[in-house]
From Swiss-Prot:
WD repeats: 125-164, 169-219, 225-265, 268-310, 338-378, 397-436, 459-500
Subunit structure: Self-associates. Interacts with NDL1 and dynein.
Chain ranges passing through the membrane: none
Superkingdom of origin organism: Eukaryota
Swiss-Prot/TrEMBL keywords: Cell cycle, Cell division, Coiled coil, Cytoplasm, Cytoskeleton, Microtubule, Mitosis, Repeat, Transport, WD repeat
HAMAP family cross-referenced by the UniProt entry: lis1
Protein name: Nuclear distribution protein PAC1
Classification via Gene3D superfamilies: 1.20.960.30, YVTN repeat-like/Quinoprotein amine dehydrogenase
Species of origin: Komagataella phaffii (strain GS115 / ATCC 20864) (Yeast)
Major localization class: cytoplasm
Protein task: Positively regulates the activity of the minus-end directed microtubule motor protein dynein. Plays a central role in positioning the mitotic spindle at the bud neck during cell division. Targets cytoplasmic dynein to microtubule plus ends, thereby promoting dynein-mediated microtubule sliding along the bud cortex and consequently the movement of the mitotic spindle to the bud neck.
Cellular component terms (Gene Ontology): cytoplasm; microtubule; microtubule associated complex; spindle pole; U4/U6 x U5 tri-snRNP complex
GO MF entries: dynein complex binding; U4 snRNA binding; U6 snRNA binding
Length: 500
């Protein structure tokens, strides 16, 4: 008898084995063979076995036991993954607590994520939906904009009252607002370098504002050329005087903000272009559209490089993912496609992009492996022989439209907001470790969140993989704008503000 099984279990197992084997013995040899097996296992003749089997063993008993064990094994594996997932959540939760005892040398800032309860709720848009938010890249200044054309400037160190409110900054909804990445010399000014803010509106205009004095915003110039609603703006990362815009007129344009002239204009979609982003070197751009697609283009020529197709509705937002995300996504992509893709192609380092993330009205957040361009000997870039991007992950926890996406400075967390009144925080590390496609944290909101912005660390290379350096430069602010005219702000209590 087995040391593991009781005597009763041991006999039951032997009976089940005989019952199972009986179906595999040819009929002409059944009496002899089964009787022999019966005597070996039970020390009983076949007739006695038949009587016992009918009385004590259900039909197909061994098969039922075996499938039950398999189901139990799968359940144990699922529970182990869940326990690992929850353990990691607790660890990150402890690091993100505002009153944690973690020492200053730890990574408590770079691992900070907003808690369930916000730090403060701001209400200066008179009930008009907040449509755009941006936090200055190195000053403690936040700009919010709303559907009635109002801009509000906030000092993050003193939120008692806004620094300035500009009513009728545009005659229609302001859909996008962006701070310049760094100071630039204005071509029409002998003054020192300027800090600029750009706004794009449904009135078809882009306005450039001087924020040298954040309490006295001044309009420098107006850029005209779009023939329909302006959806999104993005300053060039290496040539800060250049601004990229996209519009309902299906075009993507590059502007010289010093002169107001259009440097480049191209049509890459068959419908409204909703979102635009630029990679770190400024050579490539991503656009998303009402035509359900995402387009990768050369920002030098407007030439299409690749196309991502997989959303089933309007794609509201698209962003390049930092190269630091690769350590999480390479493994996921390799497992999904069984190493069919050239995940480790060194050309990704040359073009300085690899993955992107998008959110759409099909309620999903998608992560894509971007295609590489063909680079000719003259330096021109062309679509590859396989220009279609690969869908790596599709996250479907939102129950309504995904409106906006932000990437955490540590390149591990992704934050998405949706019309289901949810702010979902995704952990790429947990997605890799647990294989559970669910958010690390989900925060419910009273109003419908429509836009969000997370403060960038005050550091030259914001995609640095030096976590200690990033931790020191981290500014722990997350702002979310809502359709009820409020802005919800999360903040980690830090004694020192890191301002250049």
């Amino acid at each position: 008898m087995s040391d593991i099984l009781t005597k009763k279990q041991d006999i039951e197992l032997r009976r089940a084995v005989i019952q199972y084997l009986r179906y595999f013995v040819p009929e002409f040899a059944q009496d002899t063979a089964v009787n022999t097996i019966s005597r070996l296992l039970l020390d009983a003749d076949l007739n006695k076995f038949d009587n016992e089997i009918q009385r004590m063993i259900p039909k197909q008993y061994l098969e039922k036991k075996w499938t039950a064990v398999l189901r139990l094994h799968r359940k144990v594996e699922e529970l182990e993954r869940t326990i690992g997932y929850q353990s990691n959540k607790v660890e990150i939760e402890l690091q993100s607590q505002p009153h944690s005892d973690i020492t200053s040398n730890s990574l408590d800032r770079i691992n900070w994520v907003p808690g369930i309860e916000p730090f403060q709720k701001l209400n200066m848009h008179n009930g008009h939906p907040v449509t755009a938010i941006d936090i200055h890249p190195f000053q403690p200044i936040m700009a919010t904009a709303s559907q009635d054309g109002t801009i509000v400037i906030w000092n993050l160190l003193n939120l008692t009252e806004p620094q300035q409110i500009i009513r009728n900054a545009h005659t229609r909804s302001i859909n996008t607002i962006k701070f310049m990445n760094q100071e630039v010399m204005d071509g029409h000014s002998t003054k020192k370098n300027r800090l600029l803010l750009a706004t794009g509106s449904s009135d078809l205009l882009i306005k450039i504002w001087d924020i040298e004095d954040s309490a006295n915003l001044k309009a420098l110039r107006t850029l005209t050329g779009h023939e329909n609603i302006i959806s999104c703006l993005c300053f060039h990362p290496t040539e800060p005087s250049k601004l990229v815009s996209c519009s309902k007129d299906k075009t993507t344009k590059v502007w010289d903000t010093r002169t107001g002239s259009i440097v480049l204009s191209f049509v890459g979609h068959s419908n409204w272009v909703r979102s635009v982003d630029i990679n770190r070197t400024g050579e490539f751009t991503l656009t998303s559209s009402n035509d359900h697609s995402i387009r990768l283009s050369s920002l030098l020529t407007g030439t299409g490089i690749g196309l991502m197709i997989g959303h089933e509705q309007v794609v509201e937002k698209v962003k390049f993912l930092p190269m630091a995300c690769n350590k999480y996504l390479d493994h996921i992509a390799g497992v999904k496609f069984q190493n069919e893709l050239k995940i480790n192609d060194d050309n990704y380092n040359k073009v300085d992009y690899k993955y992107c993330i998008s959110g759409g009205r099909d309620n999903s957040v998608c992560i894509w492996l971007l295609p590489l361009p063909l680079i000719r000997s003259d330096g021109t870039m062309h679509p590859s022989t396989n220009p279609e991007g690969k869908l790596i992950l599709k996250l479907t926890e939102h129950k309504s439209w995904v409106k906006d996406i932000a990437i955490h400075p540590n390149s591990r967390f992704i934050i998405s907001v949706g019309d289901d009144r949810k702010i979902n925080i995704w952990d790429l590390g947990l997605l890799l470790e647990s294989n559970l496609l669910q958010p690390f944290r989900s925060i419910s909101t009273q109003g419908f969140p429509s836009t969000l912005c997370m403060a960038k660390p005050v550091i030259k290379d914001q995609e640095s993989d030096d976590l200690i350096l990033l931790n020191e430069a981290m500014r722990c602010y997350l702002a979310v704008g809502h359709s009820d005219g409020t802005v919800t702000l999360w903040k980690k209590n830090i004694q020192k503000e890191y301002i250049l």
